[in-house]
Amino acid sequence: MLNADHLHVARDGRAILNDLSIRIAPGCVTALLGRNGAGKSTLLGVLAGDLPAGGLARGATVRGGVALNGEPLHAIDAPRLARLRAVLPQASRPAFAFSAREIVLLGRYPHARRAGALTHADGEIASQALALAGATALEARDVTTLSGGELARVQFARVLAQLWPPPGAAQPPRYLLLDEPTAALDLAHQHQLLDTVRRLSRDWNLGVLTIVHDPNLAARHADRIAMLADGAIVAQGAPADVLRPEPIARCYGFRVRLVDAGDGVAPVIVPA
């Protein structure tokens, strides 16, 4: 379990997260919803260890506790943490002309027995991760020439390579933290990526937290929803329980209604 308890984050005297607690369970996809500036990326940064709880970090005051598999997050050294959790940040374009394959192989360095010494098996994992991300055709491409959506798929393959389970070895629960992974993707690739995330959460025993802006995507692909507003969780639970007009209005300040899609999966959320 990845736990955050009573998180308080403030920057320049302004509260960003206020007494927030959340649990990310292995084998479960949790979608984090909220309007712009609600604190979603800040929460993901604290859970990733980029904003350590218990003091000042990057100009922010962070208080509260974060534990990964029962161990305080701050007590886990960087190499081991990189094997236990992977982070896909919001889109950033590489400044150097790496190939897509080289970017994906970056996810394997935490597993190298010697610094910088990747193996043939690491190369095979990179190829399989590219295939899972629907990015095999991009393998040899210079990443500075890729579109936003193509680059997003390559970076998704990188975090898959980072958490790829070794054959025949028992693994502790691991965690995948995704910051708007579908933002640059077309409709088909949005659903393909989230389908893959949900399947791997079960097959690899991953706890997943993904920030998404479209509640309809969350309704179809998440096991749990957490809604964030003004730095606090205002609703959390199963999609059918949370994605209702009243909680959505509290989260977004926007009135909606639910329309039966006729497929028995989830209603469609549309403006009221």
From Swiss-Prot:
Q: What Pfam families does the database record attribute to this sequence?
A: ABC_tran (PF00005)
E.C. number = 7.6.2.-
Query: Which Gene Ontology molecular function entries are recorded, alphabetically?
Result: ATP binding; ATP hydrolysis activity
Q: How does it sit in the membrane?
A: Peripheral membrane protein
Main localization (coarse): membrane
- Catalytic class of the enzyme: translocase
InterPro entries xref list? AAA+_ATPase, ABC_transporter-like_ATP-bd, ABC_transporter-like_CS, P-loop_NTPase
* Binding residues for ATP: 34-41
Alphabetical list of Gene3D superfamilies matching this protein: P-loop containing nucleotide triphosphate hydrolases
> Could you tell me which residue ranges the ABC transporter domain spans?
2-255
Compartment list: Cell inner membrane
Highest taxon in the source lineage: Bacteria
What PROSITE patterns does UniProt report for this protein, alphabetically? ABC_TRANSPORTER_1, ABC_TRANSPORTER_2, HMUV
GO CC terms on record?
A: plasma membrane
Which keywords does this chain's UniProt record carry? ATP-binding, Cell inner membrane, Cell membrane, Membrane, Nucleotide-binding, Translocase, Transport
Give the family from UniProt.
Belongs to the ABC transporter superfamily. Heme (hemin) importer (TC 3.A.1.14.5) family.
What the protein does comes down to:
Part of the ABC transporter complex HmuTUV involved in hemin import. Responsible for energy coupling to the transport system.
Q: How does it assemble?
A: The complex is composed of two ATP-binding proteins (HmuV), two transmembrane proteins (HmuU) and a solute-binding protein (HmuT).
Name of protein: Hemin import ATP-binding protein HmuV
The lineage is: Bacteria, Pseudomonadati, Pseudomonadota, Betaproteobacteria, Burkholderiales
